[in-house]
Structures are given as C-alpha cells and as structure tokens.
C-alpha cells in the first residue's frame, strides 16, 4: 500500500526534486507532454529521487482536440507511464475522457471555457470510471483578473459536483521549476478556502491512491480490478 502525499508537476531535475522533498512532499508525479515524451528523462528523475529517498513516478499529459487522436494516444502510452492525464476543455474530450478507465486524470476541464466544463452526468462518469478531476493551482496563479475569478468559480463548481457524486479530485502545483513548487500546506490551505477541511485532506491524499491503484494493476497476476490469478 503506497502512502504519503504526492505533488503533480513538471519537475525532472535533481535540484527540483530535492526542493519538493524539502517542502514536505513524500513523492511526485513528474508529467511530460506527450509530444515530448522521453523515457530517459523520466528514468533520470526517478534516479534523482532514489538518491534522496524520494518517490518519483512517471506521468504523461495528452493534449489534443481530436477524439480519435486522443484515444490512439491513450492506447500508445498507457503502459509506458504510471499516470495518464488528458487536457480537457473541449466538452467532447471531457466526456470521452471520463468514460475511459484507462485515463487517470481529466486535466483542466474548464480550460478556455465560459463554464466549468462538467455537469452532473460527467461527474457521475468520472466516479464510475475512477477518473479524477484536476485543479491546477499553477494555472490559477498565472491567470489574471477576470480569468482568475472564472477559474476559481470553476474549481468551486467542480468540487461541489465531485463531492456530491464521489468523483476523485486532485490538486496539482503544475510547477515547471523550483519557483512554482508549493508546500503541501499551501495547497491544502487554499483548498480550505473553497471547501471543507476534511474534503481538502481527501483531495491532497488522492494522487498517491491513484498511483497505488495503477501499480496494483501492473502486477503480473492482476487481470483487472478485483480479479487476480492465484497459484
């Protein structure tokens, strides 16, 4: 059973990984964009983590507005990385992602939208298929004025839907370098301003549970969730 609190970011260098540990994280999901995927890059990050007793897992974000391309990319990369994210925004992409149990996280469902990107039907799909909704804290910080208030509103709306239908939620720093890294307490403190503290704790702990689930499914004797070959 994997335990601890993990950040989701784009940190691959040794200094960044040491900074994550110093800030209080137990592990990290280091996310690459699918058009820049490098096995060597993630292997180096994992090695840096091992050298300072810090868990680093591989993540990949798929970004496309074409549903067929997205589905092909999911099949291509699913077994190459630990955690698979798909960038949302387009409603057809949001829906299809939440229908796919091969995807772990729907990233930024509110991206470039005037609404929050989800409704009760999509929230139920995410709950059924164990697809988490991402709150990208880095995107919120980089936004300005009306865009920031719009993203914050989308966060609040999606949290209400996720809580009602038991849809997994993760919050990510989305950090690209040491200056974007946030301490776990900072992210939880932010969550406490838009939802209740117990739910904030659950959200902070969700990334490690997703990683643990994927590691379980990778075991040779596991056919699917709940079905194992016993010798």
UniProtKB/Swiss-Prot annotation:
Gene3D superfamilies: Metal-dependent hydrolases. InterPro entries: Pol/histidinol_Pase-like, RNase_P_comp-3_arc, RNase_P_p30. It is found in: Cytoplasm. Its main location: cytoplasm. It catalyses: Endonucleolytic cleavage of RNA, removing 5'-extranucleotides from tRNA precursor. Disulfide bonds: none annotated. Its EC number is 3.1.26.5. Signal peptide: none annotated. GO terms for cellular component: cytoplasm; ribonuclease P complex. Keywords: Cytoplasm, Endonuclease, Hydrolase, Nuclease, tRNA processing. One of its GO terms (biological process) is tRNA 5'-leader removal. Pfam families: RNase_P_p30. NCBIfam families: RNaseP3Mthcoc. Belongs to the eukaryotic/archaeal RNase P protein component 3 family. Consists of a catalytic RNA component and at least 4-5 protein subunits. Part of ribonuclease P, a protein complex that generates mature tRNA molecules by cleaving their 5'-ends. This is Ribonuclease P protein component 3. It comes from Methanococcus maripaludis (strain C5 / ATCC BAA-1333). The gene is rnp3.
């Amino acid at each position: 059973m994997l335990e601890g609190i993990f950040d989701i970011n784009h940190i691959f260098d040794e200094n960044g990984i040491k900074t994550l540990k110093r800030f209080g994280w137990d592990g990290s999901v280091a996310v690459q964009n699918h058009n820049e995927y490098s096995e060597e890059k993630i292997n180096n990050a994992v090695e840096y983590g091992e050298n300072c007793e810090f868990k680093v897992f591989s993540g990949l974000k798929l970004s496309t507005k074409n549903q067929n391309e997205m589905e092909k990319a999911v099949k291509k990369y699913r077994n190459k990385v630990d955690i698979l994210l798909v960038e949302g925004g387009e409603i057809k992409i949001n829906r299809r992602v939440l229908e796919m149990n091969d995807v772990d996280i729907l990233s930024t469902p509110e991206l470039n939208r005037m609404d929050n990107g989800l409704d009760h039907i999509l929230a139920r799909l995410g709950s059924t298929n164990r697809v988490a909704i991402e709150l990208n804290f880095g995107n919120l910080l980089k936004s300005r004025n009306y865009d920031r208030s719009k993203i914050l509103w989308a966060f609040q709306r999606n949290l209400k839907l996720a809580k009602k239908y038991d849809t997994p939620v993760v919050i990510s720093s989305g950090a690209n370098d040491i200056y974007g890294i946030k301490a776990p307490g900072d992210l939880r403190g932010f969550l406490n301003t838009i939802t209740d503290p117990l739910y904030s704790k659950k959200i902070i702990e969700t990334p490690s549970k997703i990683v643990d689930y994927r590691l379980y499914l990778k075991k040779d004797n596991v056919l699917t969730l709940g079905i194992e070959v016993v010798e």
